């Protein structure tokens, strides 16, 4: 038996904090939690406050709260007024000057929720990195979550930064998001954008892959117990595989002629397809922020400028977008005071 005599090595405050943050508890905190929990709490709390009490009369000329009679679908935390530009709208800034009521009236809650929400999503991504490191697994969950972060940052932050003000970002509400979709189509023709096409292919393709994968696994689960359902027969510590990859491979080989034979490649493909869709959509939105739009595959305006004999022509797509713009603009951008004479508005039977 050996007895070591000596003074215990002193532990610094960083080690003590590290131990406390990573302690095994019902809800893991971690270093990422220092960013995740405060920002998420403030963002979600700000959204509930705004949708319950705060009007959009001074920014959009709209009612947008439960207090004004809105429901879950029509309530929103609306974007700041166009005149605010790209100001951070700090409560103590020159616009509100510490007046909370005035801060809410000019749209300060939207900037508050959007910025804290972005940092909350980043904190959640870092949380997945941190827990993956502690558990000893690869960090692909965190990498996959970069997709939603890219979408949020591009739509709520980068798009309005490329436009005139925060006003043109989506307001934080259900109907408000659909309004933004119509706006993006009418003013940018986003459905004809190849980045949007890649995004649609990625998201719908991922949904198809998810359905096929789930059904195939359920179809090929081994009968490893006599319980009434398959869930009770499964044990999380079993050494053998739960379903037959060989049988699944044989099935899809017969159906399509080709099939995945490697689980790693199969699941990486299921990670790659939706993530590629999310990222390409985000890149497309950044393009819209810079007004890199294409109203048609070949711009009629450019051709008309080069060829004096070329006559521009309407397509149903152009007419539809023109209708969206003229229908939305007057109410959607009240600060512009648009007034359209009846003779220039698209007629209802023009399609």
Swiss-Prot record:
A plastoquinone binds at residues 213, 260. Chlorophyll a ChlzD2 binds at residue 116. The keyword Ribosomal protein does not apply. Its EC number is 1.10.3.9. One of its GO terms (biological process) is photosynthetic electron transport in photosystem II. The chain crosses the membrane at residues 39-59, 123-139, 151-164, 206-226, 277-293. GO terms for cellular component: chloroplast thylakoid membrane; photosystem II. Pheophytin a binds at residues 128, 141. One of its GO terms (molecular function) is chlorophyll binding. Keywords: Chlorophyll, Chloroplast, Chromophore, Electron transport, Iron, Magnesium, Membrane, Metal-binding, Oxidoreductase, Photosynthesis, Photosystem II, Plastid, Thylakoid, Transmembrane, Transmembrane helix, Transport. It catalyses: 2 a plastoquinone + 4 hnu + 2 H2O = 2 a plastoquinol + O2. Belongs to the reaction center PufL/M/PsbA/D family. PSII is composed of 1 copy each of membrane proteins PsbA, PsbB, PsbC, PsbD, PsbE, PsbF, PsbH, PsbI, PsbJ, PsbK, PsbL, PsbM, PsbT, PsbX, PsbY, PsbZ, Psb30/Ycf12, at least 3 peripheral proteins of the oxygen-evolving complex and a large number of cofactors. It forms dimeric complexes. This is Photosystem II D2 protein. It comes from Guillardia theta.
